[in-house]
Amino acid sequence: LHLDVAAFDFAGLYPSMILARNISWETRSPTPTEFACNLSIPRDFSETKSEHMVYFKTDELGVLPKAVMELKTLRDEYKRRRKEAKNKAEYTKWDNNQMAVKRLMASFYGVIAKQGFGWADVTLAASITASAREAIRAAAFKIQEME
């Protein structure tokens, strides 16, 4: 046990980034939008280079974020049913279902990042990981401010 230590966890970090930035094949934008991903690793948030920026449209939800949203809704339903289970077998059934959906959502990144796979897109994969790094760094800076 350690004093003054807290655990911090992002629920489904990569799927959350897909949804938060509307990251999808058809939503990539050639012009700047509010959904921007900085593919470089800046030391602080003021360091950005435009050649390392990827933008995603904000006017319509992309195919990938829609899929994440629908799966999150389905997973929440399975978790609700698990909570209401009357016996161990029912609990196990709904727990297995929600875990399957969780793994499916997590696999989206792998499918996009796997070169040679039909849906692979290095820029999308990099946008997801860059967004995740940014979220982790923002959380770390926020936590440091609280000290």
Language model region names:
Residues 1-147:
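Conserved acidic
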